[in-house]
């Protein structure tokens, strides 16, 4: 900090002489703080419940029967197989992306559960999960976990523009969801 310089007696007298006849201005301006909108936060209890639900659905012991030939795909029994075809063709473009690179299996399960919960909360029906090539651990496990979740309607190996065989496009069941009209 700079030291305050003191004025000499002469300078102080000169200042008083120059300021004679002036009066102090009264500050009457009121400054209003801008009103900020409250951002609706997801309650902590709900987040904890979503995480618990996510870990509940993904089991390592249960192995759903998935087709091992050709690209990785799955369609829930009550969903039309045409939805998988639309995923394959790229008719659906994902709105949320999840990159699992570098995560452990436990972290990947938690992130998958969080992605599905976020999709349902935000009414996003298509997401992309990038599991990568790596050591093939997450590449093998990710489809098995997704097939176990009741809100996953279908998934298919992603088209090249979304990651090809290192990613999956996932169709999530959202409340009041209707497939979009094709042009």
Swiss-Prot record:
Keywords of the record: Endonuclease, Hydrolase, Nuclease, RNA-binding, rRNA-binding
GO MF: RNA endonuclease activity; rRNA binding
Pfam families from the UniProt entry: Smr
InterPro entries for this protein: Smr_dom (IPR002625), Smr_dom_sf (IPR036063), SmrB-like (IPR022990)
Protein EC: 3.1.-.-
Disulfide bonds: none
SUPFAM superfamilies linked: SMR domain-like (SSF160443)
Residue ranges annotated for the Smr domain, each copy included: 98-173
Assembly and interaction partners: Associates with collided ribosomes, but not with correctly translating polysomes.
Function: Acts as a ribosome collision sensor. Detects stalled/collided disomes (pairs of ribosomes where the leading ribosome is stalled and a second ribosome has collided with it) and endonucleolytically cleaves mRNA at the 5' boundary of the stalled ribosome. Stalled/collided disomes form a new interface (primarily via the 30S subunits) that binds SmrB. Cleaved mRNA becomes available for tmRNA ligation, leading to ribosomal subunit dissociation and rescue of stalled ribosomes.
NCBIfam families per the UniProt record, alphabetical: PRK04946.1 (NF003432)
Family classification: Belongs to the SmrB family.
Protein name (Swiss-Prot/TrEMBL): Ribosome rescue factor SmrB
Organism: Escherichia coli (strain SMS-3-5 / SECEC)
Native organism taxonomy: Bacteria, Pseudomonadati, Pseudomonadota, Gammaproteobacteria, Enterobacterales
Gene this chain is encoded by: smrB
């Amino acid at each position: 900090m700079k030291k305050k310089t003191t004025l000499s007696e002469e300078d102080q007298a000169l200042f008083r002489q120059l300021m004679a006849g002036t009066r102090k201005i009264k500050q009457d301006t009121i400054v209003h703080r801008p009103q900020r909108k409250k951002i609706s936060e997801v309650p902590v209890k709900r987040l904890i419940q979503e995480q618990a639900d996510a870990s509940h659905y993904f089991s390592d012991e249960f192995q759903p029967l998935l087709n091992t030939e050709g690209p990785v795909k799955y369609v829930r029994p009550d969903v039309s197989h045409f939805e998988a075809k639309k995923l394959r063709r790229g008719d659906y473009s994902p709105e949320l992306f999840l990159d699992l690179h570098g995560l452990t299996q436990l972290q990947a399960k938690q992130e998958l559960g969080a992605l599905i919960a976020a999709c349902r909360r935000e009414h996003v029906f298509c997401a992309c999960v990038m599991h990568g090539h790596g050591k093939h651990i997450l590449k093998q496990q990710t489809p098995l976990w997704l097939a176990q979740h009741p809100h996953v309607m279908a998934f298919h190996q992603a088209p090249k523009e979304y990651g090809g065989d290192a990613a999956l496009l996932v169709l999530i069941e959202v409340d009041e969801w209707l497939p979009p009209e094709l042009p």
